Every structure is written in C-alpha cells, then in structure tokens.
Amino acid sequence: MQDGNFLLSALQPEAGVCSLALPSDLQLDRRGAEGPEAERLRAARVQEQVRARLLQLGQQPRHNGAAEPEPEAETARGTSRGQYHTLQAGFSSRSQGLSGDKTSGFRPIAKPAYSPASWSSRSAVDLSCSRRLSSAHNGGSAFGAAGYGGAQPTPPMPTRPVSFHERGGVGSRADYDTLSLRSLRLGPGGLDDRYSLVSEQLEPAATSTYRAFAYERQASSSSSRAGGLDWPEATEVSPSRTIRAPAVRTLQRFQSSHRSRGVGGAVPGAVLEPVARAPSVRSLSLSLADSGHLPDVHGFNSYGSHRTLQRLSSGFDDIDLPSAVKYLMASDPNLQVLGAAYIQHKCYSDAAAKKQARSLQAVPRLVKLFNHANQEVQRHATGAMRNLIYDNADNKLALVEENGIFELLRTLREQDDELRKNVTGILWNLSSSDHLKDRLARDTLEQLTDLVLSPLSGAGGPPLIQQNASEAEIFYNATGFLRNLSSASQATRQKMRECHGLVDALVTSINHALDAGKCEDKSVENAVCVLRNLSYRLYDEMPPSALQRLEGRGRRDLAGAPPGEVVGCFTPQSRRLRELPLAADALTFAEVSKDPKGLEWLWSPQIVGLYNRLLQRCELNRHTTEAAAGALQNITAGDRRWAGVLSRLALEQERILNPLLDRVRTADHHQLRSLTGLIRNLSRNARNKDEMSTKVVSHLIEKLPGSVGEKSPPAEVLVNIIAVLNNLVVASPIAARDLLYFDGLRKLIFIKKKRDSPDSEKSSRAASSLLANLWQYNKLHRDFRAKGYRKEDFLGP
C-alpha cells in the first residue's frame, strides 16, 4: 500500500426559615404508638391539671371582674414558656397543656407570641430547588444564637411591611427579579472547521441559572415576580441581610414612616403580628388630601420633610411618568429618589414606558444623578437606568451619547456595593449592542480591570480569601460584560488581550474557583468563555515576535535545508537530525512555561492543565465544559508548530483523551461541536495514532446514524467525527480494522448516500473520502466482501 494513494487533503482544514421547629411526621407517628394505657393516663393527668388550675384562679383577687395571675406565678408553678427544639426525643404534639406536675413525662409549653423581629414562615422566598435560605431578617440571625435547635426571644420592634424577598412564594416559584440582566443572548455565530467562538449574546436560558447570591438583587425593579426559572442544584448563600429591590425599599420606607407615627404607645402583652404581604408598588401612590392631582414639583420644596413623607405615604396611584421625570430635577433628594424609583418600577418590562421616558428626556436627567452627593439618589438613578436600557437599543445609544459611560466609570469608583452592582449591570446590558462593543472596549477595559476584575479575583495583589455575595455579583456582571465584548471584532479581541491584568484576573479567578470547589459558578462560565473567544484565531492575530518565538526552527525548516547547510556530519535523513525538532520543542516548551503573564496565558502550556481540570471537575454547568473544550480546540487548530506541541501535551502529559470521550458519551449537540472539534485537532497531531485509534474509533462510531429512523447529530458534528476517523485511517491500519469490526462501514455508506440537504452534502462528501481511503487497505478487501460490501460502495458516487 502506497501512502500516496490516500486522500490526505480531502478533509483537512476546518429552601423558608421558621422560628418554630415543628416535629416531623415520623415522630408524631411514633408518639401515637404508645397504646391505650398511655392515652388514658395522659387524659387523667390533664383533667387533674385543669381542676387544680381552676381552684387556683378562684383564690386570686379580681380586677374589674377578671382573674389576673401574679407576675411570677407561672414560673413558680413551673409553667414558663418553653421553646421548641427540632426533632428532640420525647417531643409530642400534645405538649402544649399546662401541668403542675414537674415529674410529668413532657414539658408544658404555652403558645409562643410572635415578634416582628423573629423569623416567620414568610421570612424567606421558597427556593427549594436551589436550597436557598435567607440568612438574616431585620438584624436577626437566621438560626439564632442556639442555631436551628430553638427560637431565641427577641425584643419587640415596630412593624414594617414584609418585602417581596421575604414573602413565601406559591409552590417553589423562583425570584424573577432579574430582568435587567437578561440582555445577553448568545446566539450561534460563524465557525470554521477548526476554530471555536462563543457568539455574541447570551441566550435567556443561559442567564437564568445564576448562583443564588446573584439572585439576591439582580434586577433594579421590584414590582414583578414570576416562576419557572432553572435554578442550580445545591447552591450556597453566604450570610447576609435579606435584600429588597430599591424601588420597593424606598416606597416601603415612606409607608413605614407614616405608619409608625400612627401607632399608639406600647400595650403590655400585645402581640405584633407580621404583615403577611407587602403592599404592591401601585398601592403606594402619591396623592394629596386636598387635591385630586399632583402639584408642581417646586411646590413640594415649601413642605417640611416630615409633612412631605406623610403625604408621600398615602399611595402611588396618582403619579405618572411625566411627573416622575420632573421629580428628577427637584432640589429635594427625597423627590429625586421617588422619581427615579417610579421610573425604575414603570420601565421594568414596559416597552412603551421606556420609549415615553426617553421622549421625556429621562436619560440625560438620570445621567446627571449618577454622581449625586446623596448616595440613595445615585442608587435609584442607576437602578432606573438599568431597567430603562434593557432590551432597548435607542435608550442605550441615548445613554452613550449623554456621556453616560464616563459618568458610570466615575460612579464605579464609589465603595458602595449597590452602586457597583448597578453600574456593572448597566455595562453588561450595553455590551449586547453590536455597534457599541468597540467603543465600550476602548473606554472601559482598563478601569474595569483595575477597579473590579483584579481586586475581586485576587490577581496582582494579596490573595482574595472569599468574595461576599455582593462582590460575587459585581464580578459576575463584569465577566458577563467581557463575554459579550470578546465576541466582537478582531480589533476588540486584540485590545482585550493587550489590556494589562485582564487575562491574569480571569485565569486567577478560575484557579481560585477550582481550588474552592466552585467551578459550577456562572462567573467561571463567563471567564472561560472570554478566554475561549480570545483564543479564536490566536496564531493569526498574536504579535509577530511572540509567534516567531513559538515557531522556532521546526521540522519543516530542517527537512528542507540543503545538505551543505547541515551542521556536522549528519544528513537530513539521519535519526540524529530527526530528533532535533523534538529537542527544539522541549526547549521552547520550557521557555514558554515560565511565569506567563497577560496574553501569554492564552498559549501557555499551563492553560492546557487548567482547561483539563475544568473538563474533569465541572459536572453540572455544560456551558463551562463546552467553553473549555472550545478554548482547547482554538489553541490546537491549524498547521502551526505550537498547535502541535499543545496537542501532544494534552494527549501525553494531561491524558485528556479519556475525559473527552466520557463527555462525548453524554454530551448534547452544543457540547459535541466543541468536543469533536478538539478531538479532530488532536488526531492530526498525535504521535501514536495506533493507540489513539484503539481508544477513539468505537466511541465515535456510536454517534453516527445508520438508518433513517436513527437520531443524528448536526452535520458539523458528523463532519468532525468523520475527519477524526480519516486522520486515523490514513496512518493506522488498526483504525481501518476497527471501522469494519464496529459496523462503521454500514453507517458511513448510509451517510454517503444521504444527500437531501446542503448540510448532508458536506457529511456525504466527507464519508466518500473516508471510504475511498479505506479501500486502499488491500489486506481488508476479503473482509469487506465477507461483510457483503463491494468496490462500488467504497469508490462509487
């Protein structure tokens, strides 16, 4: 068999929390199994207790015709209020009777009184699918000083409306207050056969599985909730206060201030019941007692602050969008906050309101409030802008034209987490517009890296122990912003590669997440996607000096050198000279591996190990593993010498083939594109193709369709699989033998004959080339005929 007969070029390049810990059903069942005798004794004991209690009440002095117990009577009789303990032995649902018998088998417990500062069954959103628990409520610990075992008494506090984050949802509905971050829909982009690029905007489904702490306060609005989100399993929420969205918090503060003045003195023994449901934003309207319309904005300046807040608390039904925009120009910060809060609420998901707000010049007025002296005004102005620009290209452009990027970066320097979350959320929304990406990259990358990425990743300074919930959300927003920018033009990718500290921060954050066991986090997904995009066409776009360093003097140069230029007594065909490129690879490898910085990380041998760890440890987030495989595909693509070096590093040192094949068995079509593309590149550069054939061929044949009824992967995946098989067949008889043994010929002939679409035409041509190469193995012709195949099946049209 002659090597020249092979068509070598045919396929080559391309949880709520409750203060009453109730017994479980299992315990109640066990207590009920005590028998009739125990029931009779218990009933007699209770009757004796009631008789003794009535006798004691008849002996006490009466006040206004009522018997009043002495203050310490309960304690002296041993009937002090008890505390429930979770799943404690001997607990019974019958333990709420009063007993004078201290030796009784149970502890009498009186009905506990609620305190608004204590936990209630409505104190956390029901997010059972993600095991998310609110961790604090009005300053109280989620589990108290004694942990979850008992409810600690808390001093009475004034009531306040329960925010929407503290209400129990219906069923297991998730908190849907995340709309203004849903601007990044990554749709399919153009790919060539060798490279892998994450396209530009995140799909809504891709942004619905945020970490729990990212959901604490993702959105700027507070008036809408919905269910059905895809929450991740087993998320952890660091201890923090329950967060309410700005508009709800502001409007409820106005109402609480009014209600607290209407409450009389404290009544001994009174029980303050928590509000079961927070009033809606619409119920907190602005109205005046003596008029049916809103007065001029400047008229409010003559009111004292106390009187203003009293009037503001009456409701929100009479305010409209034009009035809210006018409030933005008021001198009273309370009115500015109210105006921004209304705009934020109104523009949550109302496209008409966003258009009306732009026509009323709300955008420039909000921009002027980004750096207001009052931080509450800043928070609500940025929150309103975040909703205003969501899914509205005109409002995004208006923000940029009003010098909004400069003002946002000034605001980003404020050490207030709420502000920084809003600013990074606005930047993320802006980055979904293709025509703004280049300008955003030019104006924001350096400051965003210095102010957010480097400090929160621990790169270039003292290592970061752990991000709190707010810092994690800020970092997540920032990496989402970079993810969108990285899918823009070549110039934007190059600017991101050259931005000092950006790549270092991303690599450091991924390493920290792997060490902490948090590789499923969405910020890790964003970071890996950015690295994948920055690796796209890397060898064509990298600095020439770096490329020359990586290329060195390769095998091609040595093989093509004239005999007179060969130093020493070795001819170009000698074994010694053939070993020189391997020595050059090792020398360049050791040199490049030393302390990579900046864009050097993109082609460093250390990055291969990082991607391999992600492929092996990340089990739930398929987007992360897809991005890691895509990044490896990019840096092993093409005919460059360094692509071959990294391919052999992945195969021989990182042992990446088995993790890849494990992924191929269960991967969806999106993952298969990256995985098969990577295996295709590895098969071209593998030194031992016989060993690779033994591991790969049978797994890939399983993915090929063999009949019309069988489910087939996309044409791009089929082409990648056939290309891998072709790379192995032309160099390894074992691959050809395994194709016959594992019924690969039948599937290849089926693919070859199926030409019912342009995509199937591509896979058909690939199958034809592979079959033609298989026929070159003369020793297998007898086996082919024994299986019922003829020459026309291999070489025919």
Swiss-Prot record:
The modification Omega-N-methylarginine is found at R81, R261. Keywords: Cell adhesion, Cell junction, Cell membrane, Cytoplasm, Membrane, Methylation, Nucleus, Phosphoprotein, Repeat, RNA-binding. A component of desmosome cell-cell junctions which are required for positive regulation of cellular adhesion. Required for the localization of DSG2, DSP and PKP2 to mature desmosome junctions. May also play a role in the maintenance of DSG3 protein abundance in keratinocytes. Required for the formation of DSP-containing desmosome precursors in the cytoplasm during desmosome assembly. Also regulates the accumulation of CDH1 to mature desmosome junctions, via cAMP-dependent signaling and its interaction with activated RAP1A. Phosphorylated at Ser-285 when localized to the cytoplasm, PKP3 at desmosome cell junctions is not phosphorylated. Phosphorylation at Try-195 by SRC is induced by reactive oxygen species and potentially acts as a release mechanism from desmosome cell-cell junctions. PROSITE patterns: ARM_REPEAT. Expressed in the epidermis of the skin, in squamous non-cornifying epithelial cells in the vagina, single layer epithelia of the duodenum and pancreas acini and non-epithelial dendritic reticulum cells of lymph node follicles (at protein level). Its main location: nucleus. Residues 294-724 are annotated as: Required for interaction with GSK3B. SMART domains: ARM. InterPro entries: ARM-like, ARM-type_fold, Armadillo, Plakophilin/d_Catenin. The record marks S285 as: Interacts with SFN. GO terms for biological process: actin cytoskeleton organization; cell-cell adhesion; desmosome assembly; desmosome organization; epithelial cell-cell adhesion; epithelial structure maintenance; negative regulation of mRNA catabolic process; positive regulation of cell adhesion. It is found in: Nucleus; Cell junction, Desmosome; Cytoplasm; Cell membrane. Signal peptide: none annotated. Found in a complex composed of CDH1, RAP1A and PKP3; PKP3 acts as a scaffold protein within the complex, the complex is required for CDH1 localization to mature desmosome cell junctions. Interacts with FXR1; the interaction facilitates the binding of PKP3 to PKP2 mRNA. Interacts (via ARM repeats) with GSK3B; the interaction may be involved in PKP3 protein degradation. Interacts with hyperphosphorylated and hypophosphorylated RB1; the interaction inhibits RB1 interaction with and repression of the transcription factor E2F1, potentially via sequestering RB1 to the cytoplasm. It comes from Homo sapiens. GO terms for molecular function: alpha-catenin binding; cadherin binding; cadherin binding involved in cell-cell adhesion; cell adhesion molecule binding; enzyme binding; RNA binding. Residues 283-288 are annotated as: Required for interaction with SFN. The modification Phosphoserine is found at S123, S180, S183, S238, S240, S285, S313, S314, S331. This is Plakophilin-3.
